[in-house]
UniProtKB/Swiss-Prot annotation:
Annotated protein name in UniProt: Eukaryotic initiation factor 4A-III homolog B
Organism of origin: Oryza sativa subsp. japonica (Rice)
Enzyme class, UniProt record, top EC level: hydrolase
PROSITE patterns attached to this UniProt entry: DEAD_ATP_HELICASE, HELICASE_ATP_BIND_1, HELICASE_CTER, Q_MOTIF
EC code(s) of this entry: 3.6.4.13
Subcellular localization, as worded in the UniProt entry: Nucleus; Cytoplasm
Renumbered residue ranges of the record's region Disordered: 1-21
Molecular function terms from GO: ATP binding; ATP hydrolysis activity; mRNA binding; RNA helicase activity
GO terms, biological process: mRNA splicing, via spliceosome; mRNA transport; nuclear-transcribed mRNA catabolic process, nonsense-mediated decay; regulation of translation
Role: ATP-dependent RNA helicase. Core component of the splicing-dependent multiprotein exon junction complex (EJC) deposited at splice junctions on mRNAs. The EJC is a dynamic structure consisting of core proteins and several peripheral nuclear and cytoplasmic associated factors that join the complex only transiently either during EJC assembly or during subsequent mRNA metabolism.
């Protein structure tokens, strides 16, 4: 395993060769960026960004995408999905043509903005123009940018749909549609908006779905707008997040969760921690309660103005804040390297979300710890999660701080 023995581990060197892919016959595994047929100035950007070696999903998915095939790619959180999307799109786009040629839809503003950032960094030497079309930002800015001309739009379904209907986002040159975090996009209320967007796109369209989990009902939906897709799938049993130790703390009643969190606070601040609640109201309540007990925490959820969300994300990314309380808006693919502890103050409402949340705590094979607060009535959900991911969640040991 070359990645394991590399002395200088860039963000792109990963110990994930042991993932088992259930992949369409004939999909090549290409173990270096140089062998992918990528243009020279794009390769410069990839290496400048710090990548050394493609991850397992990049080794398999980039070539089919840049060859024009429809693709369903499944990769667990932290395996380099965003950079795989960015790399493929940068290769496909003709930067001499100042029109939108690729559209990437994401379920959250933060993920759409992150995709824009990574693409601009990787595509620095090809002068790619990318715009994040997301709610909470000025519509005037969207109109100005789109009329000036961009090659790629990375956005959320609502705002993208709005821009298309206003005829500000012209779709005639779009040749590639990518749905990132497709399980969330199609399975949780975004379905209608995606179909709305899809109706405006040219008939000769390449479609790619990328996600950490692909439940059966999602795969059924893909038949409606994909032609003979290449499948690149991780076996579900392999989706346990390697290197992440998972624990639970039994709490008799809801109020005890707060005391447990306070007891753990010193452990949290050893590194950086994310605490997940199921509702925005709970995030606000917990944040206020922690602060009134003199604990330093920051908070983020979907009701906050975009500017405030950006500022909070920036502080957390830079390490200025160490404990972030949030809802599942944060669980979808955001890349903060230092996070090695996740606490599920509330267990997630569905088992697919579990992997998105705890995937946050060990990106690219980094070790991590996930702690679940579990009431008596939650035991069933916890057992269901264990069974679904073929994993074991043990009671939290006293020396949990030593594991982080």
């Amino acid at each position: 395993m070359a990645a394991a023995t590399t002395s200088r581990r860039g963000p792109g060197a990963m110990d994930d060769e042991n993932l088992t892919f259930e992949t369409s016959p004939g999909v090549e595994v290409i173990s270096s960026f140089d062998q992918m047929g990528i243009r020279e100035d794009l390769l410069r950007g990839i290496y400048a960004y710090g990548f050394e070696k493609p991850s397992a999903i990049q080794q398999r998915a980039v070539l089919p995408i840049i060859s024009g095939r429809d693709v369903i790619a499944q990769a667990q959180s932290g395996t380099g999905k965003t950079s795989m999307i960015s790399l493929s799109v940068c290769q496909i786009v003709d930067t001499a043509v100042r029109e939108v040629q690729a559209l990437i839809l994401s379920p959250t503003r933060e993920l759409a903005a992150q995709t824009e950032r990574v693409m601009l960094a990787i595509g620095d030497y090809i002068n790619i123009q990318v715009h994040a079309c997301i709610g909470g930002k000025s519509i005037g800015e969207d109109i100005r940018k789109l009329e000036h001309g961009v090659h790629v739009v990375s956005g959320t379904p609502g705002r993208v749909c709005d821009m298309i209907k206003r005829r500000t986002l012209r779709t005639r040159a779009i040749k590639l549609l990518i749905l990132d975090e497709a399980d969330e996009m199609l399975g949780r209320g975004f379905k209608d908006q995606i179909y709305d967007v899809y109706r405006y796109l040219p008939p000769e369209l390449q479609v790619c779905l990328i996600s950490a989990t692909l439940p059966h009902e999602i795969l059924e939906m893909t038949s409606k707008f994909m032609t003979d897709p290449v499948r690149i799938l991780v076996k579900r049993d392999e989706l346990t997040l390697e290197g992440i130790k998972q624990f639970f703390v039994a709490v008799e009643k809801e109020e005890w969760k707060f005391d447990t969190l306070c007891d753990l606070y010193d452990t949290l601040t050893i590194t950086q921690a994310v605490i997940f609640c199921n509702t925005k109201r709970k995030v606000d309540w917990l944040t206020e309660r922690m602060r009134s007990n003199n604990f330093t925490v920051s908070a983020m959820h979907g009701d906050m103005p975009q500017k405030e969300r950006d500022a909070i994300m920036g502080e957390f990314r830079s390490g200025a804040t160490r404990v972030l309380i949030t809802t599942d808006v944060w669980a979808r693919g955001l890349d903060v390297q230092q996070v090695s502890l996740v606490i599920n103050y509330d267990l997630p409402n569905n088992r697919e979300l579990y992997i998105h949340r705890i995937g946050r705590s060990g990106r690219f094979g980094r070790k991590g710890v996930a702690i679940n607060f579990v009431k008596k009535e939650d035991i069933r959900i916890l057992r269901d999660i264990e069974q679904y991911y073929s994993t074991q969640i043990d009671e939290m040991p006293m020396n949990v701080a030593d594991l982080i």
